[in-house]
């Protein structure tokens, strides 16, 4: 197919694999080719190349049968059929990114990853989602030591072959301009960038001062539920070394036992 060199799905497209494996060297298609205007499906899923759609309705059936919502449908009939979101709406389900994996052609692609890299340029690493207690299995794909894409790793006993948009697209926050990349110390009402040695030494002096003046009960450690098991273990070791017994991770003012 002529679109393959410019299609974002090139190299991992089922239609491309079948065409190369079983297709002829020349096309017998003589009819006028369809040209479909791209649809707006939201900030995560790109439907700019809907002329490639083969109307398999995988995306429609996924949103209805797996996600449990009706946000995508087949409009019109015959050669005028189009896959589109409901009029005046976009795809908002928290599982919307899975339609990208389900699409067997390059009709539905990832907006954040669009034209970022080819599949054969990416290195793959297996990992587990840290965003909730489910522990969805993931494949993190990197290029030039930078995370470029996150895909589901099939595990029938946990997440099957689906992942939430939170797991799929949260990697963008790793390199966001608003994320702190160096420690900061506040002095005279202003924040200043410092190196890690200076920051850790400042923390040590502050803790020593508080413990010396107000006892250990004046110190508490607040861990994040997003931390890994290894990070929480080190947090506990730090608390034991300081003799601190006040440790918590609850961010909401509610009884965690409920």
Language-model features: where?
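Extracellular/mature segments of secreted proteins
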Residues: 12-16, 172-173
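Ferredoxin-type iron-sulfur electron-transfer modules in oxidoreductases and energy-metabolism complexes
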Residues: 1, 14-51, 61, 66-100, ...
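Intrinsic disorder at enzyme termini
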Residues: 3-11, 30-32, 160
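Surface-exposed, flexible loop/turn segments at secondary-structure boundaries
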Residues: 12, 80, 227-229
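Catalytic alpha/large subunits of respiratory electron-transfer oxidoreductases
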Residues: 8, 49-50, 55-56, 60-61, ...
């Amino acid at each position: 197919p002529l679109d393959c060199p410019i299609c974002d799905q090139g190299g991992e497209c089922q239609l491309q694999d079948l065409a190369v494996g079983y297709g002829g060297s020349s096309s017998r298609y003589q009819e006028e080719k369809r040209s479909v205007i791209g649809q707006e499906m939201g900030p995560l899923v790109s439907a700019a190349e809907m002329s490639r759609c083969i109307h398999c309705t995988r995306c429609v059936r996924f949103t209805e049968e797996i996600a449990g919502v009706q946000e995508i449908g087949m409009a019109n009939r015959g050669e005028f059929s189009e896959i589109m979101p409901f009029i005046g709406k976009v795809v908002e389900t928290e599982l919307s990114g899975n339609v990208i994996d389900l699409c067997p052609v390059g009709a539905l692609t990832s907006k954040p990853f669009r034209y970022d890299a080819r599949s054969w340029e990416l290195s793959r690493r297996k990992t587990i989602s840290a965003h909730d207690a489910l522990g969805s299995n993931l494949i993190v794909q990197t290029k030039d030591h930078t995370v470029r894409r996150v895909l589901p790793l099939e595990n029938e006993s946990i997440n099957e072959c689906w992942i939430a948009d939170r797991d799929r697209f949260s990697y963008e926050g790793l390199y966001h301009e608003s994320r702190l990349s160096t420690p900061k110390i506040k002095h005279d009402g202003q924040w200043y960038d410092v190196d890690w040695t200076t920051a850790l030494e400042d923390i040590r002096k502050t803790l020593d001062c508080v413990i010396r003046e107000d006892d250990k009960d004046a110190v508490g450690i607040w861990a994040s539920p997003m931390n890994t098991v290894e990070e929480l273990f080190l947090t506990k070791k730090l608390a034991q070394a300081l003799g601190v017994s006040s440790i918590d991770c609850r961010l909401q003012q509610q009884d965690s036992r409920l």
